[in-house]
């Protein structure tokens, strides 16, 4: 199936694993193909993890962050987006943290109230409270006044730091230009020729209106069964049907002579 451009990397990866796919086409609301993402693209997304602004560049929704972390937004609007700022782990003393945390940043903290207050005082955009820590009413009220989103998660900070980048929507990583697609009425011989000239393993297939309907892979073409035919009366290539070389000849029945046809397997020849 096609995926929506706002689907998170985590959900896209789960969908690809469910269907054992290496390529996931991305469609818009009316089913028109918009782009695609591969498992290689998802793997490369982790290579940018050293950039602590990559999350904001991907602009995930707070709801998507919460779903990725199997957590809950307890303060703030879950439908808003994290669009600017860096990602921090609040593991230092507050006097050190306040020198680094800036406005609109996202910070992961534990159960220490002074750390939580430091994050709110810095006007961070989001605070993720780890290990299922209960957030006090006073902290929630202060965060509400400062427009700081609070997300609580059962995971530890290390796990959150690993998973949070999976909340980025796949539109941030998808390929949009130079896509190789096929129409459902294209001939397999033509498709094979194109496939041999590219490194991709799977290709989107669309109908005449450009709507995505499925994918075709190299493996699919390897499993194509040739048409089986029996030649009667004439067995010269020039007298046979077009593209006879692409068919599997089972038997030849002819009362003339043996022609010049070649096959990859033994055939039954009856001269009568």
Set out the residue ranges of the language-model regions.
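Non-catalytic interface/targeting segments
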Residues: 32-106, 177-186, 196-198
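Feature captures the catalytic cores and cofactor-binding loops of soluble hydro-lyases/lyases
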Residues: 88-173
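A glycine-centered beta-loop-beta connector
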Residues: 16, 24-42, 195, 203-219
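A short, polar/charged loop-to-alpha-helix boundary motif
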Residues: 39-56, 160-161, 219-231
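Beta-strand/loop-dominated core regions that host nucleotide or nucleotide-derived cofactor-binding catalytic loops
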Residues: 3, 9, 13, 17-20, ...
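The conserved cystathionine-beta-synthase
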Residues: 2-20, 27, 46, 117-121, ...
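Structural motif
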Residues: 23-25, 34, 86-87, 94, ...
């Amino acid at each position: 199936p096609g995926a929506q451009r706002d689907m998170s990397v985590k959900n896209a990866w789960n969908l690809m694993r469910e269907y054992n796919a290496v390529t996931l086409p991305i469609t818009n609301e009316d089913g028109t193909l918009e782009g695609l993402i591969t498992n290689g693209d998802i793997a490369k997304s982790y290579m940018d993890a050293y950039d602590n602004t990559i999350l904001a560049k991907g602009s995930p929704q707070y709801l998507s962050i919460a779903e990725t972390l199997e957590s809950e937004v307890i303060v703030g609007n879950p439908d808003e987006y994290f669009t600017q700022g860096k990602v921090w782990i609040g593991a230092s003393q507050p006097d050190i943290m306040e020198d680094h945390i800036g406005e609109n940043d996202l910070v992961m903290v534990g159960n220490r109230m002074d750390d939580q207050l430091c994050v709110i005082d810095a006007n961070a955009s989001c605070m993720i409270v780890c290990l299922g820590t209960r957030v006090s009413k006073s902290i929630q009220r202060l965060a509400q006044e400062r427009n700081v989103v609070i997300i609580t998660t059962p995971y530890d900070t290390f796990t959150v730091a690993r998973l949070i980048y999976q909340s980025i929507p796949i539109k941030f990583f998808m390929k949009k230009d130079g896509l190789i697609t096929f129409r459902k009425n294209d001939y397999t011989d033509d498709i094979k020729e194109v496939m041999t000239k590219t490194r991709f393993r799977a290709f989107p297939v669309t109908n005449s209106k450009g709507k995505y309907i499925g994918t075709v892979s190299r493996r699919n073409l390897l499993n194509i069964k040739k048409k089986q035919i029996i030649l009667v009366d004439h067995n010269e290539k020039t007298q046979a049907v077009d593209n006879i070389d692409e068919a599997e000849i089972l038997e030849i029945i002819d009362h003339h002579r043996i022609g010049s046809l070649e096959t990859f397997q033994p055939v039954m020849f009856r001269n009568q």
